[in-house]
A protein has these predicted regions:
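Flexible, low-complexity junctional segments that flank or bridge functional domains
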Residues: 2-4, 21-278
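Bacterial N-terminal signal peptides
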Residues: 8-16
Length: 278
């Protein structure tokens, strides 16, 4: 692949990223409903077989262990217990002890159903947060916020959820206020931040869910055991070998856009002078 073609591809990717970022996600049905892909069943069966037969920590993938995997996965999806409702969690109660069977068979229905529900609820929460930004800011009350709700019960109803997010938005506003930002600027920054969070929901894919499910399983066996998807394995190997292939540019997300964070001196991107950092 010649340098010109590489640069053309990179420019196209950057423009495509900006076009996607410009799309406004305003409805829950714009968040994809993710489903298990065919290869995941085979991988799940093999990972489960390897863990149950060869892991140094001996364990039984029984109903009790399945319930622990469920609880870990649930907390990975909603660590602060401010997205899901108690009724959301309750509707999966009779499925808690079946996850071992799902992992063995490769049919990960509960994992995907719970992830999709969490995505829907998270979208609703950020939509609510955006609506809160339209209210006048008021820092005169004696408000408190619990910054660690990992052990707190899930909210019983939407009113309780709203109260938690009222506090979250006020905390975000006050944090910016203390840096000297004006009210209009605070609203603009938080609007961008919350909309970016919504767009990231729409960018989730089936592999993300599968990796999360496998890691809930792996971490319950041992906190130092991980499952890496093919994409993350490639990234891990690159970091370990300190090697970099491609046009020699490091990309990152900045708010809604993909930007060039740095370029490798002497690489195709730097030599072309067609791209700049920032």
């Amino acid at each position: 692949m010649n340098t010109f073609f590489k640069m053309s591809v990179m420019a196209g990717l950057l423009l495509a990223g900006q076009a996607i970022a410009a799309d406004s996600i305003t409805r829950a049905d714009q968040i994809p409903q993710l489903h298990e892909e065919p290869q995941h069943a085979t991988v799940s069966e093999r990972v489960t077989s390897r863990f149950t037969r060869s892991h140094y920590r001996q364990f039984d993938l029984d109903q009790q262990f399945s319930a622990k995997i469920f609880d870990r996965y649930l907390n990975m999806l909603d660590y602060s217990h401010n997205v899901l409702l108690a009724t959301d969690v309750a509707q999966f109660a009779d499925k808690k002890t079946t996850l071992g069977d799902e992992l063995r068979s490769g049919k990960l229905t509960v994992f995907y159903d719970l992830f999709n529900l969490a995505q829907k609820r998270r979208f609703e929460r950020y939509q609510y947060a955006l609506s809160v930004l339209n209210r006048p800011m008021n820092f005169t009350g004696n408000d408190t916020i619990d910054t660690d709700r990992s052990k707190a019960p899930w909210p019983k109803n939407v009113a309780e959820l709203n109260a938690l997010w009222d506090a979250k938005v006020k905390y975000d506003q006050l944090s910016l206020k203390l840096t000297g930002k004006k009210d209009a600027e605070i609203k603009e920054i938080l609007t961008r931040r919350y909309n970016s969070a919504i767009r990231r929901l729409a960018q989730s894919n089936s592999e993300d869910v599968f990796q999360l499910a496998m890691n809930a399983f792996a971490h319950e066996i041992d906190p130092h055991t991980n499952y890496l998807s093919p994409r993350n394995t490639e990234q891990f190997n690159t970091e370990m070998s300190l090697s970099l292939e491609g046009i020699g540019a490091v990309l990152q997300m900045d708010e809604d856009y993909t930007v060039i964070n740095s370029m490798v001196a002497g690489g195709p991107a730097a030599k072309s002078k067609a791209l700049n950092v920032g």
